[in-house]
Amino acid sequence: MESVPESVPSPNSNTPSIPPPVNSVPPFLSKTYDMVDDPLTNEVVSWSSGNNSFVVWSAPEFSKVLLPKYFKHNNFSSFVRQLNTYGFRKVDPDRWEFANEGFLRGRKQLLKSIVRRKPSHVQQNQQQTQVQSSSVGACVEVGKFGIEEEVERLKRDKNVLMQELVRLRQQQQATENQLQNVGQKVQVMEQRQQQMMSFLAKAVQSPGFLNQLVQQNNNDGNRQIPGSNKKRRLPVDEQENRGDNVANGLNRQIVRYQPSINEAAQNMLRQFLNTSTSPRYESVSNNPDSFLLGDVPSSTSVDNGNPSSRVSGVTLAEFSPNTVQSATNQVPEASLAHHPQAGLVQPNIGQSPAQGAAPADSWSPEFDLVGCETDSGECFDPIMAVLDESEGDAISPEGEGKMNELLEGVPKLPGIQDPFWEQFFSVELPAIADTDDILSGSVENNDLVLEQEPNEWTRNEQQMKYLTEQMGLLSSEAQRK
């Protein structure tokens, strides 16, 4: 609100006239009002929420900036004394808030009602002394009230700091106690370590103690061995079969036994070959006993002129029953790569160490040959050992009887006339080109053959896969029995 003008402008001029000195507002009150009413000074001093008092928010800033600007000094205590002489009182004890009935916001004309306390002219000397004493008392009253509050606040802060100090001292004592406990434990550990070192030194100097300790360790080891080597006892049938197979081998040799194809599987394969009308199998069906493998050089080796450098194919070759070992010696040298036109399944075949074959590390990973572990580092195959012993008697009736006795424990597949095999021989297999044609033919001819007969090859592969799965099921069932 705008203040009421204290002077009335004259009708002859536009400028206001100078107010008369009689009944004028004291300069202190006028300057104080302008200072409080200025919006630029609200951060330091401003009106209160009720607009009936003013608050000094920052006394240091008020003394440093505003007092020199309006009153030519920077003494805040002198300003408080001046307020006291004009009847101002402190409203809030926690802050510098002063009020007067004639000091209101927007009503500057009421400043005329504020009168300074001063003595009369008759008793001027006495009243002056009284005024001085009263003014000093009033100033002390206002200042004393603020200082007491400040002292109380400082006392409260001191109490808080003392409590924090006590808490920190308690934590320090607890930490010192923990450090002492840790130091004691460290000393105990050092003493134990010294005792152990002295004990070990004495033990090393005493040979009887060392002998006793070694003997005790040996006794403890002997006690632990029987318990650690306990195994589950096998059934009677499995023990008899295993005893018969291992008794024919060398003594104190650890072998991994894997049965080869038996007579029933050979007869089944003969019948399978006899049922085929392919010219490829006619030469084999004429001699049912002639079956197995021969080495065929790969196309890469043939092109390079070094047919013995690499073997990647498999062919059918004839051999007599007396040449089992010579046939098996050729197996590790051949890498049985899968040819797209050869739908044969080759069983795993071992090798006898007496034939001087290559070591197991040089064999192709496509073979799952029978491995062995012996004390002397030699390889031993129980099946090949049986064949070695019965090679001289293979033709005589006594040799055949001995072979039958040795193979009694081996599980056998169903017989030739079993109706189970009839489902595999109801469909004739398609003709397959000879090995010579495969080697001499180019890749284009092979692709042409595959394009001409895709359905027959697919049906042939499905039949062979199904036959292989059924043979695996039969072998697993025979082992369970």
From Swiss-Prot:
Subcellular localization(s) per the UniProt record: Cytoplasm; Nucleus
Family the entry assigns: Belongs to the HSF family. Class A subfamily.
Residue segments, region Hydrophobic repeat HR-A/B: 138-204
Annotated region described as Disordered, given as residue ranges: 1-23, 213-244
Modification note: Exhibits temperature-dependent phosphorylation.
GO terms for biological process, alphabetical: response to heat
Domain note: The hydrophobic-rich region (HR-A/B) corresponds to the oligomerization domain. AHA motif is a transcriptional activator element.
Gene: HSFA1B
Cellular component GO terms, alphabetical: cytoplasm; nucleus
Name of the molecule in the record: Heat stress transcription factor A-1b
Protein's job: Transcriptional activator that specifically binds DNA sequence 5'-AGAAnnTTCT-3' known as heat shock promoter elements (HSE).
SUPFAM superfamilies in alphabetical order: Winged helix' DNA-binding domain
Signal peptide: none
Subunit description: Homotrimer. Binds to HSBP.
